[in-house]
UniProtKB/Swiss-Prot annotation:
The keyword Cell cycle does not apply. Disulfide bonds: none annotated. It is found in: Cytoplasm. The active site is at 83 (schiff-base intermediate with substrate). Belongs to the transaldolase family. Type 3B subfamily. It catalyses: D-sedoheptulose 7-phosphate + D-glyceraldehyde 3-phosphate = D-erythrose 4-phosphate + beta-D-fructose 6-phosphate. This is Probable transaldolase. CDD domains: Transaldolase_FSA. InterPro entries: Aldolase_TIM, TAL/FSA, Transaldolase_3B, Transaldolase_3B/F6P_aldolase, Transaldolase_AS, TSA/FSA_arc/bac. Keywords: Cytoplasm, Pentose shunt, Schiff base, Transferase.
Length: 217
């Protein structure tokens, strides 16, 4: 499963990328606001850090304006993925931009039917939001499973990009289900390496090693 990092923080992206943990990046208007930077400037910098897909989101609501913004964003770098909302206008823009050879990430997906429409419109990625469904006492991971089944049934090439990942358990669940990609904030990715028994075991090893009085270097 590919790891995308969900942030516009270039330092955090670079640190994870140096570890080989970043296959791509996703951004949205909220993350651009949090960065306090110009969207074109920060997106261009991100595209220079990672070689994989970098999702940059349009802010228009009508198809023609979405298409124009998508073309503008795609000029930033070859690895730009134009991010579009899952609306009829977004699907129309998806069809046009994908026909032009541009990568498209259709976002804000909350149902398998929506994911089916995005695949038929030629989306490169579909982004189902797990955490927001969980907030409504629904099973976000069940949605990932349903989309996986539909895409496999009909041979769609659209990649499932599990989004709104909030916990390490979410990461494990979507990996078991078979999501192609997951995108998560840097802090969630950092937590994947943590386990209390690892810490406890390391502490015991260090204590015992100190008692030997030996050194390696």
């Amino acid at each position: 499963m590919k790891f995308f990092v969900d942030t516009a923080d270039t330092q955090a992206i670079a640190e994870l990328n140096d570890l080989g943990m970043v296959d791509g990046v996703t951004t949205n208007p909220s993350l651009i606001l949090k960065s306090g930077r110009d969207i074109i400037e920060v997106t261009k910098e991100i595209c220079g850090i990672v070689s994989g897909p970098v999702s940059a989101e349009v802010v228009a609501l009508e198809a023609e304006a979405m298409i124009a913004e998508g073309r503008k964003l795609a000029e930033i770098a070859e690895n730009i993925t134009v991010k579009l909302p899952l609306t009829w206008d977004g699907l129309k823009a998806c069809k046009t931009l994908s026909d032009e050879g541009k990568m498209v990430n259709v976002t804000l997906c909350f149902s398998a039917n929506q994911a089916l429409l995005a695949a038929k419109a030629g989306a490169s990625f579909i982004s189902p939001f797990i955490g927001r469904l969980d907030d409504m006492s629904l099973d976000g991971c069940e949605l990932i499973e349903d989309i996986r089944t539909i895409y496999d049934n009909y041979g769609f090439g659209t990649e499932i990009l599990a989004a709104s990942i909030r916990t390490v358990n979410h990461v494990q669940q979507v990996a078991l289900i078979g999501a192609d990609v997951m995108t998560a904030p840097p802090e969630v990715i950092q937590k994947l390496a943590s386990h209390p028994l690892t810490d406890k075991g390391l502490q015991q090893f260090m204590s015992d090693w100190e008692k030997t009085g030996q050194k390696i270097l």
